[in-house]
Each structure stands twice: as C-alpha cells, then as structure tokens.
C-alpha cells in the first residue's frame, strides 16, 4: 500500500511540475485594457489626433509595446436609451506595478478628449515569450 501511495504521489508531482512547461520563459503579468471612446462633445476624435495621443502618451509610458484594437462600444445612456460609439482599445501586457502608468494614460485621454469616463480593466495574464531560438528547437 505504501509503494502504491508513493507512486501515485510521484505521478501527481510530475503532472504538476510539467503541465506548465512551454517553449520560452513563462511569467505572470497583467493584461490591461484601456477603452477609449472616439466621440466627444466636440465631435469625433480624428485618427491623426489619436495617433498623436498614442505617440506622446502611450508609447512614452510603454516603449516596449502595446496593441490598439478598433471596436464599437454599446451601453445604456443616462436616459436609458441604447447607445453605441466607435472606440479604440489599448492592450498592454506589463508587470503588475505598471498599474499607475496605465491609469495615467487613461486619465490623460479623458482629459485631452473630454470623455466622461474611460474604462480600464486588468486581469492576470500568463505570458510565454517564443523567440526564433525557441521556434528552431535550439
């Protein structure tokens, strides 16, 4: 009975140790999403204005990179009417201590483009960096 229990424990330990293995370095970071509405009281935010904002604020805060997605946001307005708006979503994968930099970008967007709100979400993200070396199996 003891050998059987020991064998099962070893088997389970191997599963735990090797189940997370993948090519490249694995680390746990955060995935931040900043939802930026493209409408304001003054009209639509132009692509040029958006690009200037990203160049000045987002790229400066996250020089290692970020991703921008085009989106359409839907919500209920204060009058309970359905509303939709063109939007941009900035995806940033960074260490947990980047939270204040992300919030600073969101605050700056809200200020620069007269937004009532800018939504920021954060979730844990397991990241795996796959390099050319890993892809070649070396």
Residue spans of the language-model regions?
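Short Gly/Pro-enriched loop/turn and capping motifs at secondary-structure junctions
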Residues: 41, 72-75, 97
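Extracytoplasmic/secreted cell-surface and envelope-processing proteins
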Residues: 43, 77, 129-130
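C-terminal motif of bacterial Sec signal peptides marking the signal peptidase cleavage site
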Residues: 17-20
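Helix-rich interaction surfaces within compact, conserved domain-sized segments
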Residues: 82-138
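Bacterial N-terminal signal peptides that target proteins for export
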Residues: 1-10
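N-terminal secretory signal peptides
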Residues: 22-69
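Short, intrinsically disordered low-complexity segments
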Residues: 63-89
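Classic N-terminal secretory signal peptides
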Residues: 12-14
């Amino acid at each position: 009975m003891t050998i059987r229990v020991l064998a099962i424990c070893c088997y389970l330990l191997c599963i735990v140790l090797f189940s997370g293995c993948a090519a490249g370095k694995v680390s746990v970071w955060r995935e931040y999403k900043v939802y930026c509405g493209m409408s304001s009281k003054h009209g639509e935010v132009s692509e040029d204005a958006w690009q200037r904002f990203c160049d000045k604020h987002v790229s400066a805060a996250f020089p290692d990179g970020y991703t921008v997605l085009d989106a359409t946001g839907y919500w209920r307005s204060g009058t309970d009417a359905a509303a939709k708006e063109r939007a941009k979503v900035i995806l940033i994968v960074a260490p947990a201590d980047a939270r204040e930099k992300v919030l600073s970008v969101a605050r700056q967007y809200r200020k620069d483009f007269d937004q009532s709100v800018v939504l920021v979400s954060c979730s844990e993200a397991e990241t795996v960096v796959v390099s050319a070396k890993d892809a070649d199996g070396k």
